[in-house]
Amino acid sequence: MSFSVEVLAGIAIELQRGIGHQDRFQRLITTLRQVLACDASALLRYESRQFIPLAIDGLAQDVLGRRFTLEGHPRLEAIARAGDVVRFPADSDLPDPYDGLIPGQESLKVHACVGLPLFAGQNLIGALTLDAMTPEQFEVFSDEELRLVAALAAGALSNALLIEQLESQNMLPGSSGVFEPIKETHMIGLSPAMTQLKKEIEIVAGSDLNVLIGGETGTGKELVAKAIHQGSPRAVNPLVYLNCAALPESVAESELFGHVKGAFTGAISNRSGKFEMADNGTLFLDEIGELSLALQAKLLRVLQYGDIQRVGDDRSLRVDVRVLAATNRDLREEVLAGRFRADLFHRLSVFPLFVPPLHERGDDVVLLAGYFCEQCRLRLGLSRVVLSPDARRHLLNYGWPGNVRELEHAIHRAVVLARATRAGDEVVLEAQHFALSEDVLPAPPAESFLALPACRNLRESTENFQREMIRQALAQNNHNWAASARALETDVANLHRLAKRLGLKD
């Protein structure tokens, strides 16, 4: 068997049919898996000595959440170094990164593997991996034919990365124009809620607006702040972190604004505060709702006039700082209760973001579980850590009141338990390794001023409410439109029309 012109043309046509990069990537690897009759295929992006899965076919869903470092995966390191088609013999002693991750074949190891490095010019930008349980599966294809496949995949990935960079440059003045792939932010998730959040981050990152990040405890608000900073013109300067909840009132002002020698007992020298440290960069104030009203007033002055005063000093210092603030409180309620200044709230919430709770993110739970499994594998020096099908279902059925942080701890604990009950360096996580209650119900969605921004009129408010209702229904029903329509008690055709009118569908 060999590739015909018709086969290659068919692959190219499938790429053109895709709507958006992700759809094109999925069409590419699905078509390749069919053409090559292999058991699994994956398109990976290369960045910072690791491969990041972009699209998979025939592999467990949690693979999309894993990050494959070169140091931890010798086969992928060989692909990255080769510069050409890499064929691994069936008896290769190099472990395959997908062992145990092909559904229905969890107990078997991959026998045939081909790796195709993908280049943009001289730069490695990714790889295409093809795996089969039959040892001789890829012998009928020549290296030249596989190079043609690699060229098609490299073109699709290179175009996607270039468009991504150009879109970013439109928001970042002074960009160099040199091809530089956008950096990974570890914001893992493909659910509608996370896709929307990522879009909002892209919109606001390139501006210099202050941002208020809301969400339940453990949802990943700090990661959002890092992503905003990383995508901003200030990314070359520091991102300074301060947890306001951990600040005793007696030292809070000094931590924020600094102090001069002799300002108080123990002030034995001049000391810069967080605002000075973050000059020309970004200051992330976590749990900002915990600040006292007196400190809120001083923080407001910095946001208004851009100057600070060290404790014990009469002089003012100019600072250029972007403030990102996070809270798990409803600050609008805090304002009404007199515990938070209304003027500071409005200064901070120019562009509010809301990080969705984990129970609203659908299958993102499995992707995140894969990410934490890979972290545990590297940390404990194991050859593999995989989730059984029962374990995946168990994780999806749980409500996760502690959100992503609870999931991370649950995975780490389960790996330790599973490792203790099984000899060797291969760990399979089963449902019984997780101390989770099956009857835990998802926490009710957080009512937040962040979920729906202030609107000018009734129509705009109604449309925003409808958008949020549809997004939540889709997230809770794994993006199944028919199931979402039933949950909303409406006809599916009407739901599609409404979603198009509201800009939720093309």
Swiss-Prot record:
Pathway: Nitrogen metabolism; nitric oxide reduction. GO terms for molecular function: ATP binding; ATP hydrolysis activity; DNA binding; DNA-binding transcription factor activity. Keywords: ATP-binding, DNA-binding, Nucleotide-binding, Phosphoprotein, Transcription, Transcription regulation. PROSITE patterns: SIGMA54_INTERACT_1, SIGMA54_INTERACT_2, SIGMA54_INTERACT_3, SIGMA54_INTERACT_4. Transmembrane segments: none annotated. ATP binds at residues 215-222, 278-287. The modification 4-aspartylphosphate is found at D57. Pfam families: GAF, Sigma54_activat. GO terms for biological process: phosphorelay signal transduction system. InterPro entries: AAA+_ATPase, GAF, GAF-like_dom_sf, Homeodomain-like_sf, NorR, P-loop_NTPase, Sigma_54_int, Sigma_54_int_dom_ATP-bd_1. HAMAP family: NorR. Required for the expression of anaerobic nitric oxide (NO) reductase, acts as a transcriptional activator for at least the norVW operon. Activation also requires sigma-54. This is Anaerobic nitric oxide reductase transcription regulator NorR. It comes from Salmonella heidelberg (strain SL476).
